[in-house]
Amino acid sequence: MSAGGQRPRRTFVCLSSQRWSDGMWTNKQHVMSRLARDHRVIYVDFGTRPMAEILRRKIGAPEGAPSPAGSSMGRRGWGARLDPLAPVVEERGGVTVLDFPIPRFAEYLPHGSRARAALEFDLRTFALGRWMKTEGLARPVVWVYHPGFGGGVRSLPSSRVVYDCVDEYTTFPEFRGATAWIAGRERELCAVADAVFCTSRPLFDAKAALAPGRVQLVPNVADAAHFERAADPALALPEDVAHLPRPIIGFVGAVSDYKVNLGWLAHLARQRPSWSVVLVGPHAVADPTTDLSQLRALPNVHLVGYRAYEVLPAYLKAFDAVVIPYRLGAATRGIFPLKFFESLASGRPVVISRLPALEAYYPDVLVADDVDSFVNACAAAVALEDDAAARERRVALARRNTWESRIAQMLARLDELDELSAPRSP
């Protein structure tokens, strides 16, 4: 922070674990879109593309004609189009999005293999460094979400390296058989990071030894104002749930077996056949082994699939209670679900499994330890739905935990680091 109290305008380069255009926004897009209001943000897309699509995007448009809409190849025109490592550059709402040409066949290589790491992470880091040099981009804050980038990020010209740790990647299904590799990469990243932010107490405890004195707990939050729209009398209910039998017990999020206890939901539907159980979200994300057959077989379970972020408040308005029935185990020990405060902001009663990261909020929700207590908690939640005072307490709690407050904490830490490293007057 400057002597006049003004925060310096920074440049952030975000090495993400998700595409900017992903319909299910998470920490990455929420944080970077808000940072872009006052700072320059460059967002490096994650993932791969088929070679044919890479070629189409790089050379399929005449000079000066972006392809797709809003994209370009940066400053070098046709030279960049012919450069195999040059990114497609797009401007998205004040954020510069870089999509480097990482070929799709990288995804068929085993996680943890030298070849896959070289293509998916090291090549992207190398290509980013070249682009930064070409663009004259010096000393930005490099903000990392995926630990797979490892210590290689220190090769980038940066003023600071931040690791925003939002998940325990060693438990992800995609890294089964490669947990030692991803853990090693995370150790490398923590060793070079100037600041490590963790979204839950279990994550903080796990990373504290990897970056002594540089780890800070900054829990997940929500866009409370967006989800408070669920209380708007003028907001129409979505047609696919508007006429379902009530009460409606709803879940919003990726329907993946490694996180969501599908057995609990099936048991609830069987025990309460007159109720409706609605699951809003894509299926089998990050876990292709997810089996939804037991849910599909139940007439009162409704798998509506992915819905855009903009319409989620309308679905929450339709629910009589919101559930977050995550499995209890290694994969969820460090999870602080974004949907927690989003659900509270809707005003609806919330039922959760006993997630360690949410322990401080147990008094504000209904907590289930097993399948039978889950059914009982849902019944209790339905009975609470008309309690106006309880509804306002839930909304007030969500309002105290916003993206703006989380970002302010993280920027304050960067300011502290600047002050500590600033030259002292004699």
Give the ranges of each region predicted by the language model.
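Carbohydrate-associated surface elements
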Residues: P202, V218-A230, F319
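Nucleotide-activated donor-binding/catalytic signature segment of Leloir-type glycosyltransferases, i.e.
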Residues: G281, T289-P313
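Conserved donor-binding/catalytic core segment of Leloir-type glycosyltransferases
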Residues: V241-K259
